[in-house]
């Protein structure tokens, strides 16, 4: 039997990080549903094929219909600035945002800059903000240049978000573990 740890989200940014189908989105929806104010859901997915369209529909069905939906594949700071600062913001997901930026021919440096600007705007919000992203660095080294670039760029993006997040949770098999920082003293 597993233990239960209570994690209280403050008004800062929370990063939900984990593998595909790990329960990140379900956790975000649960947290959003318990928020007493308005919730804005920013979706970055693009329905490029029937399978992706089905996945998007399922995610839509899982969310409360009263939530405001923003569909923005290239989500940026100007979009975030237009959101009611008292509304909880859920971004699903950073993984697809980074993929979209790569396919929009953005350089690694431009994507790194995007991460710095977006993370600054997200932590400046008054209401809780949840950013969802995949951890893709735990598997094999991709066998092609694009795969390695994606893994590296997303890893850097996640690091920037995590460094500024009030809370970072790793989600696996529907369970969340809080990630902390370690202070090393070699002596």
Which residues are covered by each model-predicted region?
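Helix-adjacent hinge/juxtasegments
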Residues: 65-113
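Phosphate-binding P-loop
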Residues: 2-14
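Structural motif
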Residues: 15, 88-90, 130-132
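Short coil/turn segments at beta-strand junctions that form active-site/ligand-binding loops
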Residues: 12, 37-38, 85-87, 127-128
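Conserved P-loop
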Residues: 14-82
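Short, well-ordered beta-strand core segments
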Residues: 39, 89, 167-170
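Residue-level signal for inorganic ion chemistry
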Residues: 28, 59, 90, 134, ...
């Amino acid at each position: 039997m597993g233990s239960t740890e209570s994690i209280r989200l403050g008004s800062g940014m929370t990063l939900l990080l984990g593998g595909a189908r790990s329960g990140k989105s379900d956790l975000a929806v649960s947290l959003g549903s318990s928020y007493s104010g308005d919730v804005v859901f920013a979706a970055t997915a693009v329905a490029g094929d029937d399978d992706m369209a089905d996945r998007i529909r399922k995610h839509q069905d899982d969310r409360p219909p009263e939530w405001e939906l923003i569909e923005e594949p290239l989500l940026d700071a100007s979009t975030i600035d237009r959101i009611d600062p008292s509304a909880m913001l859920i971004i699903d997901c950073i993984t697809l945002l980074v993929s979209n930026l790569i396919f929009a021919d953005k350089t690694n440096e431009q994507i790194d800059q995007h991460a710095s600007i977006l993370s600054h705007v997200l932590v400046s919000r008054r209401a809780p903000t949840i950013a969802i992203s995949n951890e893709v660095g735990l598997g094999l080294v991709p066998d092609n240049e694009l795969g390695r670039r994606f893994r590296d760029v997303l890893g850097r993006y996640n690091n920037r978000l995590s460094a500024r997040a009030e809370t970072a949770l790793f989600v696996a098999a529907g369970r969340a573990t809080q990630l902390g920082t370690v202070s090393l003293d070699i002596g």
